[in-house]
Amino acid sequence: DVHWKADSIASEKAGERMSEVLDAEKPDLVIFTGDVIFGKPADKSMRCALEPTIKRGIPFAVTFGNHDDELGMSRKELYDFIKDMPGNLTSTVEGLSGVTNFILPVKASDGSQDAALLYVFDSHSYATLKGIKGYGWIKHDQVQWYIDESKKFTEANGGIPLTALSFFHIPLPEYHEAVQNEGTFLIGTRKEKACAPEINTGLFAAMKEAGDVLGVFVGHDHVNDYAVSWKGIMLCYGRFT
């Protein structure tokens, strides 16, 4: 979560830290896991939040959180705003729930074939069913899309699942289960209960069945900064900027 506010001194300082990290790490790709902006005007805040990455010529991708579309621009409008920015790899699947659902294949060193996959999901914003409170969840059609795409990649790879990671904003309910189990080992800092949705639509189970995703990376909970292995999949947080 960058939570960029245009013309905010705090955001400018955060931008300096982001620049330091980018210069030190020199990543091949940056993925923003939602709540990129938190101030109006939305377009200016978004451009400023992405600028340190764009300035360095580093490819990037964005998925949206629950706050991004609360600042005067819809998810689709934000997607259209960033789609032609230099280095942007964010994509969308027409007809699928949400906006920022896409797959980034990682090629083998010789560029001959896909060697790994990065699955990015739109985890939406808030609960939309009567009687259900809290945050939104990845919908059934998104889970089915993942199942179908994962199967295609596995079949194309001779029946062997391609190593994959997944990125979205709101943590899965399994983040709760993992930390409540005495047999798990948590690395990092946990200062609050994961603000996961009350509805579990089975994405974690689908990932286990597919056998490709080794790690899930989310944001959303600002004072959580940890990784925990649950049933063979690492459940991780990205640090709040």
What do the PLM-derived regions correspond to, one by one?
Residues 182-241:
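Conserved beta-sheet core of the metallophosphoesterase superfamily
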Residues 1-52:
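N-terminal active-site segment of His-dependent metallophosphoesterases
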Residues 31-36, 153-177:
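Short acidic, glycine-rich surface-loop motifs adjacent to enzyme active sites
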Residues 47-159:
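Extended active-site neighborhood of metal-dependent phosphoesterases/phosphodiesterases
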Residues 25-30, 55-61, 114-117, 159-164, ...:
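Loop/turn elements at helix/coil->beta-strand transitions in domains of secreted/extracellular proteins
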